[in-house]
């Protein structure tokens, strides 16, 4: 009995070996290096080549593509092909049957998105053999870059140049400033008076960032070329934006300043002493008592940070937007955002509309913080914010054309952006009295551009 069982096992092994030898060798090859990079929204082909020792018969073979995302350690089926059956589990996914005859089992995906990055596995079955291969797919988005001059709130002979990069992925990016003078034609990197803000995530998963260069044209040579250089892994070569400094306004020489001062310093001294006595010393106590505890709107929000529903917003982002980005925006009705913040309903509304029209959805939740501050009189009183700022003092209200806009009422915050938190560098201030918590409501879809007053 034992001899017969051993003989049967030996015969089975010989038959299996003969079948495998007859079937031939099956092998799958993917992208060299194991990683494939593709631009966002491109039509991508993920390569998979099948090598078989015999001619392929697609009616008796199977192809299945799987994807494992970067965030979840679980495979999902993307496409399958067996004989005359094929099914796409991702819209538009396809493997060309006529290319498969020559061993090309590549997967085609139109309009690739960021969330579709991950590990792709190509599994090929030619009965009784099976082979597979994997490749990492990375999706990148190239930044769009622009350079502009911010003329809001700058002094004479000063300039604030903004270099904005938007819509890039992944988050890592490098922005540097260089200058090239007539005397030194080789570009050199600038390290002083450069401020680069935080990277802000957009609703589509891409990122934005702004870098600022401050210049005093009276201290720079006319004809100097300045350059903003943007490096990102999606770019083959860096993006470069240039501007040339024009001739600075004439200012007095040191000799002229010295001559003028030597002639007039006596009367200037007496006048200066008089001004100090009249303007500073006499009302000093009254001024201190009145203004020592007053706060700007931005400072008030920072001070009472825990009174707001901040969610995932960051203080440093609010500071950057309020002091750098928003003052450079050209708002309607002649409004301009002050670096210290605002509780003027016209100014806040126009900034809110501008951010929505320009697709700056990540900034809208930070604007909502000023709406929330304005709609809390107790907090405004606690911060000693000027009551005049709580009324419509300039511009044109968004509801001016409405017959029901005779009376201004507090604004509802039901139009905030999805996934938006409220609010930016924590200075240390004196502890305020306890205040009531403010919780703006955040919807699940992008809001409309009009913000009517109820």
UniProtKB/Swiss-Prot annotation:
Start and end residues of each stretch annotated as Interaction with NCR3: 59-62, 127-130
Transmembrane feature ranges: 263-283
Span list, region Disordered: 395-454
SUPFAM superfamilies listed in its UniProt record: Immunoglobulin, Retroviral matrix proteins
Start and end residues of each Ig-like V-type domain: 27-138
One GO CC term on file: plasma membrane
Topology relative to the membrane: Single-pass type I membrane protein
InterPro entries in alphabetical order: G_retro_matrix_sf, Ig-like_dom, Ig-like_dom_sf, Ig-like_fold, Ig/MHC_CS, Ig_C1-set, Ig_sub, Retroviral_Gag-Pol_poly
Keywords of this entry: Cell membrane, Disulfide bond, Glycoprotein, Immunoglobulin domain, Membrane, Repeat, Signal, Transmembrane, Transmembrane helix
Subcellular compartments: Cell membrane
Residues linked to a glycan: 43, 57, 208, 216, 242
Domain Ig-like C1-type: 143-246
Annotated region described as Retroviral-Gag-like, given as residue ranges: 291-429
Keyword Cell membrane attributed: yes
Low complexity bias spans: 439-454
Topology feature Extracellular, residues: 24-262
Signal peptide: 1-23
Biased composition (Basic and acidic residues): 397-416
Cystine pairings recorded for this chain: 48-122, 163-228
Domain notes: The C-terminal part is similar to retroviral Gag protein. This putative protein seems to be the result of a fusion between an Ig-like domain-containing protein and a ERV.
Name of this protein: Natural cytotoxicity triggering receptor 3 ligand 1
